[in-house]
Amino acid sequence: MSNLQTRIITAIVLGTITLWLTWVGGVGFTLFSIAIGLAMFYEWTELSATRQTAFSRLFGWAWLIVTGILLILDRGALLTIGFLVAGCAILLVTQWKSGRGWPAAGLFYAGFSALSLSLLRGDEPFGFTTIVFLFAVVWSTDIAAYFNGRALGGPKLAPRFSPNKTWSGAIGGAAAAVAGGLLVASLVAAPGGWGVPVLALLLSIVSQIGDLAESWVKRQFGAKDSGRLLPGHGGVLDRVDGLVAAAALLYLFGAIFAEPDVPSAIFFSF
C-alpha cells in the first residue's frame, strides 16, 4: 500500500470519527478536544525533551488535566483561560533557564487548542455549524494544497523547513477553503456578504501558517514527524497543526466580537 493510500484511509477513518463526535457534541466532543490536547502535549514534550525537566513534565500534565476538568465542568471560558495562562506563566518563570520557553509554549499550545475546539462546538444552535465550517475550510485547504502542489509544482513556499510545500499549493488551498466555507454557509442559510469568504480565507492562511510553524518546531529538534500514532500522517501534531491554529483564530474572533462562552455566534453575526 502506497503512502498516499495509507494517508487517505487514515484521513477517512479519523474524519468519520470526528464528524460523528461533532454531531453528538456535548461532553463527548469536549472529551475528544481534551484528548487532542493531551496527545499534542505528549508529542510536544517528546519533541522538546532536551528542554524539559521532570518538574516541567509533571506540572504541565497536571495543569493541562485540570484545565480539561474545568472545560468538562463548564466553569466559564474566562476562568479556564485565566487558569491556563497562569500555569504557562509559572512554567515560563520557573523553567526559563532550562527550557527557554518551550515547556510553557507546549502547555499553552495544547491547552488553548483543546479549549478553542471545545468552546467553538459548545451549545446549539451555532456550535455544530461552526465546527463543520471550520473543518470544511481546513480540510479543503489541506486537500487542495496537497494535490494542487503536486500537479503544478513551482516555487517553494518555505524551503528551509518545509521543502514539499509550494506557492501553487498554498494558493490553491486558500481558494478551495473559500469555496468550502461558502458551501457550508449556503447549506445552513447563513448570512451572505463578504464576511464568510473573508473569514474562510483568513482561517485558511492561518491554518497553513500553523502547518509551517509545526514544521519549524520539528526542524529545531531534528525530527521528521511529531510522532507515529497516525499511519501516513506521522503524529497528532502533524495532523492537527493547521486545524488548531485556525480554531484558535476563530475562537478569538468569536470571543471578541460575540461572546467568550459562545464564540460560535460569530458565524451568524456578519
UniProtKB/Swiss-Prot annotation:
Q: Write down the chemical reaction(s) this protein catalyses.
A: a 1,2-diacyl-sn-glycero-3-phosphate + CTP + H(+) = a CDP-1,2-diacyl-sn-glycerol + diphosphate
Kindly give the Pfam families that the UniProt entry links to this protein: CTP_transf_1
Which molecular function terms from Gene Ontology are attached? phosphatidate cytidylyltransferase activity
Q: What is its EC number?
A: 2.7.7.41
Indicate how the chain sits in the lipid bilayer: Multi-pass membrane protein
Family in the record: Belongs to the CDS family.
Q: Which organism is it from?
A: Brucella suis biovar 1 (strain 1330)
The record's listing under PROSITE patterns reads: CDS
| Name under which the protein is recorded | Phosphatidate cytidylyltransferase
The gene coding this protein = cdsA
* Pathway(s) per entry: Phospholipid metabolism; CDP-diacylglycerol biosynthesis; CDP-diacylglycerol from sn-glycerol 3-phosphate: step 3/3
Q: Which InterPro entries match?
A: PC_trans
Would the keyword Lyase turn up in this protein's UniProt record? Answer: no
